[in-house]
Amino acid sequence: MCVSRLVLLLGLLLCVGAQLSNGQHWSHGWYPGGKRELDSFGTSEISEEIKLCEAGECSYLTPQRRSVLRNILLDALARELQKRK
């Protein structure tokens, strides 16, 4: 009974403390609500990425599943070898 009251009191204090604190941190260039300053993006960077994608050289659009699976398997094998030593 005493433990349940203590847990309830701690939970209530946590909720009230979270509401009263000013714990939100905004990174440089970001505004409340996740909005970002548009001037921070370089237009040349964006246009270069678009040009590469139009030419069919978008490396981030091609599936990288084989290399990911290969890396997972290699890591698993390396762990097994370390366990045996």
From Swiss-Prot:
Coiled coil: none annotated. One of its GO terms (cellular component) is extracellular space. The modification Glycine amide is found at residue 33. PROSITE patterns: GNRH (PS00473). It comes from the Eukaryota. Residues 1-23 form the signal peptide. GO terms for molecular function: gonadotropin hormone-releasing hormone activity; gonadotropin-releasing hormone receptor binding. The keyword Secreted applies. It is found in: Secreted. Keywords: Amidation, Cleavage on pair of basic residues, Hormone, Pyrrolidone carboxylic acid, Secreted, Signal. It holds the Pfam family GnRH. InterPro entries: GnRH, Gonadoliberin. The modification Pyrrolidone carboxylic acid is found at residue 24. Stimulates the secretion of gonadotropins. Belongs to the GnRH family. This is Progonadoliberin-2. It comes from Sparus aurata (Gilthead sea bream). The lineage of its organism: Eukaryota, Metazoa, Chordata, Craniata, Vertebrata.
